[in-house]
Amino acid sequence: MSFMKEFREFAMRGNVVDLAVGVIIGAAFGRIVSSLVADIIMPPLGLLLGGVDFKQFHFVLRAAEGNIPAVVMNYGSFIQSVFDFVIVALAIFSAVKLMNKLRREKAEEPAAPPAPTTEEKLLAEIRDLLKAQQQK
């Protein structure tokens, strides 16, 4: 089997394709959540806290000197990243919880009893005939 044929079979397996789709959708969802946090949630939150822009929160570890830029710890960006994570985690938790609920409901549906085989039908008829003879 040639290398390209093996690779094609590997790449076209359902799990690999599903994983690729999941990664692409996850990346797009991450950008949407980042925009939601940065552009929708944080501005009103900053306004409620007195017009604060969280991106500007930082500690100066070393001031700028000449051509050397300042060394800062941007904890405001970290706060935004934490909000991003919490929203993504809630969305994933909700999706998994819904999937588990649907899976449980599907599993709880009782399976239809199997239809009796021909042998079972014949045995039931013989049993019924024997019972009828004993009652006479």
UniProtKB/Swiss-Prot annotation:
Q: Where are the transmembrane segments?
A: 10-30, 76-96
Where is it located? Cell inner membrane
Tell me what topology the record assigns in the membrane. Multi-pass membrane protein
Keywords, ordered alphabetically:
Cell inner membrane, Cell membrane, Ion channel, Ion transport, Membrane, Transmembrane, Transmembrane helix, Transport
Which Pfam families does the entry link to? MscL
Any GO MF annotation of the entry: mechanosensitive monoatomic ion channel activity
Listed under GO cellular component are: plasma membrane
InterPro entries per record: Mechanosensitive_channel_CS, MS_channel, MSC/AndL, MscL_channel
The family classification in the record reads: Belongs to the MscL family.
HAMAP family assigned: MscL (MF_00115)
Q: Which NCBIfam families match?
A: mscL, PRK00567.1-1, PRK00567.1-4
Q: How does it assemble?
A: Homopentamer.
- Described purpose of this protein according to its UniProt entry: Channel that opens in response to stretch forces in the membrane lipid bilayer. May participate in the regulation of osmotic pressure changes within the cell.
Kindly provide the name given to this protein in its UniProt entry: Large-conductance mechanosensitive channel
Organism (species)? Yersinia enterocolitica serotype O:8 / biotype 1B (strain NCTC 13174 / 8081)
The gene designation is: mscL
